[in-house]
Every structure is written in C-alpha cells, then in structure tokens.
C-alpha cells in the first residue's frame, strides 16, 4: 500500500510529466471571454499597429458581443487548441472590442469613436468578426474597409480558422486571392 507521501510524490510527477497547463479563456465581469495573451491596448489603433509591426507581428481586431454563442466557441474551441493559440501568438497582436461598446477608440486616421460607432464605420454588423490590418503606416489615408487585408465574419471550424490567420501571416494577400490560397492549400 502506498503511503500518503509516496502518493503525493507520484501525483506531482504525473502533473509535471503532463507539461504546463494551458491558459484558458477567462470570463470578464462584462460577460466576455478574454484570452490572457490579447493585447492590453490604449485603443489607439495606429500605435497598436506600430508596436505589433515592431514586434514582427500583424494586428487583428476581434469584435464580440455579450451572449454571442459563436464568440464563445471561438474562445473555448479554436483558441483552446494549442496549435492555433501558438500560431496566433507568434504572428499576431489581437485586440478585443465590443460591437455595442462605448469605450473610445482612436482609429488609424486619428478619429475618436466609441466602439459601436467604430464597428459601424467598418461595416461590422455581426459577431464574431475578426479584422486583419496591413502593417503599413499609410492606413489613415485609406477608406476604413480598404485598411483591411482580410476579415473573418462568423464562426469557422478550427482548421479553416487557422488557415485564415495563415493567409495573413504569410502575406498571401499580396500574391493573390484568398480563394486561390485556399485552393493551393487543399
């Protein structure tokens, strides 16, 4: 029969062998899931773009709303997969915004808007929506939708979700359409 000490040592050994625990999405007081690796932003998009570019990453904005079942799936299914989390963390800075929120965000052109007004400016109507922005310093001079290099609207299964992030990370949008990229991947 194992002593308590032996049992505790064996349990600790199994826990260590399993590897480090993966961070899980946390439900915020506002009713949103949040990943601990999302960017803590002052909500000044031009500055966030500069810092992500300096870190060798691309900028993505995820729009969510309280009670959105597919937003929940993005966090509890897609972001919960270690391969997806690792890929996104290596290649992107991600900012989370509320489709109906009132926090003030400074857009690339210096215009200050509430989250709800910013969403309307970009034509974001549903959640989850993920916008991907080009790492260029002239975005302020472009129309809002022309600033994006890709957009995910709605929930995508993990494989397709990861492929959309790869399309941007690999800058495949500079060489052709998403459709051509996905065809080459199949």
Where are these regions (language model features)?
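N-terminal secretory signal peptides and thylakoid transit peptides that target proteins
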Residues: 1-14
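N-proximal helix/coil linker or "cap" segments that precede and/or mark the start of modular domains
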Residues: 24-38
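A short beta-strand-turn-helix
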Residues: 41-58
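Short active-site neighborhood of thiol/selenol oxidoreductases, capturing the structured segment around
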Residues: 55-69
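Typically the conserved alpha-helix immediately C-terminal to a functionally engaged Cys/Sec
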Residues: 72-87
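Thiol-based oxidoreductase modules, predominantly thioredoxin-like and allied folds used
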Residues: 85-113
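Structural micro-motif
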Residues: 115-131
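Non-catalytic, surface beta->alpha helical segment in thiol-disulfide oxidoreductase systems
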Residues: 126, 134-173
